[in-house]
C-alpha cells in the first residue's frame, strides 16, 4: 500500500508538454474568474468548477446533485463531479499556448542553460526570443551558418541572393527547433575532446557546457522541454479570490498574471486564424512571451509587471523565494494548534521541574483531554454534552482538569530560541491569574527576565511525544549547557547574594562567638532566638553514620548552608578530615557553579535538581534577611583621588609642552596622554577597592557575582576614565568625575558617544548573529552520529592554544571527554594514565596537566570516516549529559547552536592600531564570520611557503625577507609598506609561518600546510575570538563546522571516471568512485581538497531541498531540475519540508523499525 508519507526519496525534473497535459484536468480557455452577480465561478475560466472541482462539498455547479449519496457522479448538465471541495487544492489545469514560449529560468539564469547548450550568448538568444533578429535554423545550400543571427535587412538580402533554399526562424519556435536538433552524445564527445586542448576562459566555458550536456544526457530530460507548449495552471485554492466587506474582491497576484497570459494567448489564436500580417503576429507573440515570463518569474527580465500602487506582482518564483516564500514560511515554519502564549512571572515556590499554567489557558489547551475524562467519569453521556460542560465552566471541570494535567508535561518556549535549551518541558501546576509562572533557575537557559517577556506553551499530544518530553526535555534533564558542559542552571542575583551573605567569613566579636552546640537543631534554635549571630564562629558536634563524632568549628551560616548539601562532593579529602564541612568557603557565583557541577557528576540530575531547589530557597531567604541594599553612603570616594588627578594633569601638561617645542610627535603625545589617564584611572580604582569594607553592600554585590563589576564600582565612586568616540578612537579628555559626584556638561557629552554606539551596535549584532546561526545550522544540519566507531587510525595532536605568552585555551578543556587511540603514559614512571581507546575523564585530564604533558594525540571529528555524519568515538562526550554521545544525536545542529548562541555577546568592533598604515584588526563577530566564510581577511599577513632561516634585507623604504631552507632555493618575500615584521634576523621558521603581523588567508594554509593545517588554524582562531570575550565553547563544535567546510574536493582530472572536471564532489563519494575505477583497472580521477565558506558549502550540498530552502532558491531548483536530481532525504531539513519525522534522535530508522511482539505468559 502506498502511504503518502512512505517514500525514500524525491526527484525533480523538467516537465514535458505531455506531462503537463497529463497533470491537467482540463484547459482554461477564458480569463474570467467569477461571475460578479452570482459569485459563482465562470465555466472554462480560472476558477472553473468543471476543471478544478466543486466549491461546496458534495454539490455540483447547477445544484442538480446535492448530498454525499451522489459521491463521484458527474453532473450531466454542468459537467461538475460531485466530491469534496478539498480537491480544489490539488487539481491542476493548463493553458494550450498558440505558439511555444521559452521558460525564463533556463534562458535567463546565470549561466544561461539554453545559451550553453546552443553555444550562443544570452544576448543573441534574447534577440531571437523577443523577435529582434532572425536565426538560421537550416542553412541549406547557402553560405550561411546554422544559428547565425540575421537582422531584417540581412534577411531580405539573403532572400534575394539565395531564394527559399534556407530556413530561418524567430522566437521560441526557432529555439525549440535548434534544441531538438542537438545530438547530446556527439556534443559530449566533442566537448571532452576540446577540453584536452583548451586553457583559461575557454576551458571554463567548455567545462560549463559539458556540465549542462552531461546533465541532460544522464537525467533523461530533453533540451526542447525548456520551451513550453502548454502552461500548467495551479489549483485555484492556492491562488484564492475572497470577497471583502464592501463587495470588493481581494485576489492573489497569480490570477492577474494568468489572466494576462490567457488574454494574450486568445488574441494570438484569433490573429492566427484571421491570417494577420506577420508583424502583428510577431508583436503579439512577444507580448505573450513577456506575460509568460512575468508569470514564472516577474522582474527577472525588464521592468516587473506592477499591480495597483506600483507594487510588483508576486510570480510563481516569488512564492518560493525568501523568508515569506513557501519553503521558509510554510514548510520549515508552521504554526501549531494546542499552543498559547502569555507574560511570564517568577515562581520561586515552584520545584525545578514545574511551571505555573493559568487556569483559563490550561482548560483551553487540554480541552479534548478534559472532555474525554468527563465522559469516562460519567459527568457527561457523550462528547457533545461534555463540550457544553467545559464551555459553561462547571465546577467539576476544574477537578477533572487537575487530574488530566497531573502527569502531562507541557513545553515552554521563549523566542528567540537560540539553542536547544530555549524549549524545555515542565509539569504544569494550575495558577490563578493570566500569567505563566517560571522557575527562576531556568531563566539563564531561556535568557528570560520578568520585565514583560512572553513565553509560548505547547502541549505534546501523543503518548510518544509525552514520553520524549518527559525523558529528554524535562528541565531536570537539561542542567548542563551543550556548548561547554558547564551547569547552565547556576543560581544568579538574589540567590547568590543570599548564599554569599550566609557563608561570609567569621566576624570578630560577633554575638555568640565560641559557643558549642550538641546538634544542628540546638544551633538553629539559638539562631532563631537571636542568641548567636549568623557570622559567629561556633563549634558543633558532628556525628557520622558509623557513629564517630567530633566537634567542628565554622560559622553558624556555613552550618546552615551545609545542612542539605551532600558531604561527598570532593571539596574535602574525606580520608584526612571525615568531619569537616564540605563547603567551608565563601559561596560566590563561581563556587556555587562548582558545587552544582560536582553534584551532577557524582549524583546525577535528580539529586542535583533537589540541591538546586535547596540553594534557591536558602538564597532567597537569606538575601531577604540580610537586607543587602544600596545607599548613597556606600559609595565612598577615595581621599587620594584629587592627588592622583593633579599629578596626571601635570604630566599631560608636560607632554603638551614637549609637543609644542617639537620634541615629540603628535602621535607620541596622544599615546602618552592616553597612557597617563589609563594609569590614573587604575590607581583611583585600586584606592577605591582597597578602601571598601568587606561588608560594604556594593562590594558584596560585585564580589559575590550577583550584580555589577569592579568596572561599574569605579564609575560610581572612582572616576569614569577615558571614553571612546563614535569611530572607536579614544578621546584624550577623560571623565574625571564619577556618578556620586556628578558629571560636568562636557563630561556628560563625551560619555554620550559611547552610549549611543553601544545601543546601535547591539541591534546590528543581533541581526548579524542570527544570520550567522542560520548559515551554520544549514551547513551542519545533516551531521548526525551514525555509528559507534568508524575505525579510523587517524588522530590529531592537541596542545594548549596560546597567543604570545597568554594561554587562550588550556589543554585540559581540549582533551576532557575525548577518546584516545594509543594509551597515554606517565613520562616519568611509564605507567598508563589513560588506556588505549577510552575516554579521558576529568581526573585523568587533571593528572595529565599536573604531569606537565604538553601534547596529546586524540580522536576528533576532523578525522572521522563516517559518511554523512560522525561516529560517537570521534565525537566523544555529549556535553549536555556528560556521558558518551548516543547514536542519532544531531551533533551538527548542536554545534551550530553552540557557536551561534553566544554570537550576540561578541563585539562588532574593529580595533584601530595606531601607526601610519593604521591597520584595522577585525575582531568579534565579523572575524568569526570571516573565518567560517573562508574569506580573504583584511590586513593580510605574508606567509613563508618553505621552512628555513630568516634573513632580513632593508634597502631604503623597501623591506625584503629571505627564507633560506636547508636545501632547495631561497624564497624572497617583499614586505608591503606599513606592515609590521613579526620575525627576527636568523630565526628558524616552519612552512606556513607568518612573516608580518595580521591574519593569514585560510586558502594559503590549505596550499602550504594542507588540510590539517587549515583545520587547526580555523579552530584556533575562532576559539581566540570567543575566549577573549569570555565565552567558553568546546572545540568539537567548531570542528564539526570545519569538517563540513572541508567535505568537498574539486576534480582536476576525471581520469576514466564519470566525474566532471572542475566539479565539486564529496570527499567520501570521490574516494569510493576512485576505488571502483581502480578495481576495474581504469585510470582514477585526480582532485584536490577545497575549503568552502559555510554559505557555499550549504549550497553545494547533495540535497536540493535543503539548498533551495536556504538561499538562491530559483538557481538551485533550475540546476536540480536539469540534472534530474534525486534527494535521498538524509538531512533534517529535507524531512521537515516533506513533513516526515527527522532522521535523528528517536526518529532514526534504527529506532523506528521496532515491532512489538506479545510473548505468551
UniProtKB/Swiss-Prot annotation:
Q: What is its EC number?
A: 2.7.7.6
Concerning SMART domains, the annotation shows: RPOLA_N
Q: Which Pfam family, giving just one, matches this sequence?
A: RNA_pol_Rpb1_2
Q: Which cofactor does it need?
A: Mg(2+); Zn(2+)
- Give any single GO term for biological process: DNA-templated transcription
- InterPro entries hit by this protein: DNA-dir_RpoC_beta_prime, DNA-dir_RpoC_beta_prime_bact, RNA_pol_asu, RNA_pol_N, RNA_pol_Rpb1_1, RNA_pol_Rpb1_3, RNA_pol_Rpb1_3_sf, RNA_pol_Rpb1_4
User: Which amino acid positions bind Zn(2+) 2, per UniProt?
Assistant: 790, 864, 871, 874
Residues annotated as binding Zn(2+) 1 are 60, 62, 75, 78
Q: How is the cofactor bound?
A: Binds 1 Mg(2+) ion per subunit.
According to UniProt, the reaction catalysed is: RNA(n) + a ribonucleoside 5'-triphosphate = RNA(n+1) + diphosphate
Molecular function in Gene Ontology: DNA binding; DNA-directed RNA polymerase activity; magnesium ion binding; zinc ion binding
What are the annotated GO cellular component locations?
A: DNA-directed RNA polymerase complex
Record key words, sorted: DNA-directed RNA polymerase, Magnesium, Metal-binding, Nucleotidyltransferase, Transcription, Transferase, Zinc
* Binding-site positions, Mg(2+): 449, 451, 453
Q: What does this protein do?
A: DNA-dependent RNA polymerase catalyzes the transcription of DNA into RNA using the four ribonucleoside triphosphates as substrates.
Subunit organization: The RNAP catalytic core consists of 2 alpha, 1 beta, 1 beta' and 1 omega subunit. When a sigma factor is associated with the core the holoenzyme is formed, which can initiate transcription.
Instruction: List the PANTHER family.
Output: DNA-DIRECTED RNA POLYMERASE, DNA-DIRECTED RNA POLYMERASE SUBUNIT BETA
Family from the record: Belongs to the RNA polymerase beta' chain family.
This chain belongs to which protein, by name? DNA-directed RNA polymerase subunit beta'
Q: Which organism is it from?
A: Clostridioides difficile (strain 630)
The organism's taxonomy opens as: Bacteria, Bacillati, Bacillota, Clostridia, Peptostreptococcales
Q: What is this protein's gene name?
A: rpoC
